[in-house]
Amino acid sequence: MTTIQQQRTSLLKGWPQFCEWVTSTNNRIYVGWFGVLMIPCLLAAAACFIVAFIAAPPVDIDGIREPVAGSFLYGNNIISGAVVPSSNAIGLHFYPIWEAATVDEWLYNGGPYQLVIFHFLIGISAYMGRQWELSYRLGMRPWICVAYSAPVSAAFAVFLVYPFGQGSFSDGMPLGISGTFNFMFVFQAEHNILMHPFHMAGVAGMFGGSLFSAMHGSLVTSSLIRETTETESQNYGYKFGQEEETYNIVAAHGYFGRLIFQYASFNNSRSLHFFLAVFPVVCVWLTSMGICTMAFNLNGFNFNQSVVDANGKIVPTWGDVLNRANLGMEVMHERNAHNFPLDLAAAESTTVALTAPAIG
């Protein structure tokens, strides 16, 4: 009994030091308990992604024995290459390497894709938790991790929720540049995402956030308090940790209030920076919600053949032009996996060309 107790004591002797090191804010890079989960997951995802991008064999993404190559060694470049999503034959089944009969089978069915996205999603979730943890240790407010939840929600939407709704991980976003574009085209063709209000909010958040960031940066830079001569860099006029304001917010407020109108300009630095944070974050949240609803085929607005004249004849609109583009993309994607596109098979026949009204 004494021997067993001594062995346990020796094994646990370094545990307090390990705990102190993990939670110490004096480390050059904070680890944290979430970091203990984050680091191995992100390393595994990055390692598998790099190896698969370079050397993975073609993947039978559609489940029809027509493999699609995505790696460098099979003729792709940095633009066309991707980690190809797992096969439609696998569907939503969890497909770790031990579920396959051989490694060749695992590679052929796109096993690396699931390995990468699952470790990646766990890793970025742990990174978000680590942001909260470090804020807590330093006595800061927790809004940094709340802001980071916006891109995390987007990643979960395209890598997890959308495949769940569509019934297969083969519908997830490929891990590559051209693959991402293909995902976007197919998403538009099948769900009309450009006509979804939540996607519109996301566009407003991205472009609006960029605009507000540029406006704020240029206003601050233009109203710096002079601390240097003409021959010195203006950056030398600021010392890290100084108590004095480095720019004149009254001047910036006065300029912008006169450029637009008074109440378009913030007179409170705290409310200004809160707005700069919350606007793009909420808009990206809305976009993620839109992806999640369209995953279950609650799609964007449909204005096909919505305008008719007094005789009941259809007057083509831009809604019909957009519908033609969607149909064109839909008939061309996964060409050999379908006998006929679902949208064309389930609806009335659509004219191939928009006809001009007869004159006279």
From Swiss-Prot:
Transmembrane segments: 30-47, 119-134, 143-157, 198-219, 275-289
Disulfide bond listed as a keyword: no
Site entry: Cleavage: A345, A346
Record-annotated site: Stabilizes free radical intermediate: H191
UniProt keyword annotations, A-Z: Calcium, Chlorophyll, Chromophore, Electron transport, Herbicide resistance, Iron, Magnesium, Manganese, Membrane, Metal-binding, Oxidoreductase, Photosynthesis, Photosystem II, Thylakoid, Transmembrane, Transmembrane helix, Transport
Residues annotated as binding [CaMn4O5] cluster: D171, E190, H333, E334, D343, A345
Binding residues for Fe cation: H216, H273
Family: Belongs to the reaction center PufL/M/PsbA/D family.
Complexes and interactors: PSII is composed of 1 copy each of membrane proteins PsbA, PsbB, PsbC, PsbD, PsbE, PsbF, PsbH, PsbI, PsbJ, PsbK, PsbL, PsbM, PsbT, PsbX, PsbY, Psb30/Ycf12, peripheral proteins PsbO, CyanoQ (PsbQ), PsbU, PsbV and a large number of cofactors. It forms dimeric complexes.
Record's function text: Photosystem II (PSII) is a light-driven water:plastoquinone oxidoreductase that uses light energy to abstract electrons from H(2)O, generating O(2) and a proton gradient subsequently used for ATP formation. It consists of a core antenna complex that captures photons, and an electron transfer chain that converts photonic excitation into a charge separation. The D1/D2 (PsbA/PsbD) reaction center heterodimer binds P680, the primary electron donor of PSII as well as several subsequent electron acceptors.
Protein's name according to its UniProt entry: Photosystem II protein D1
Taxonomic source organism: Prochlorococcus marinus (strain MIT 9515)
GN (gene name): psbA1
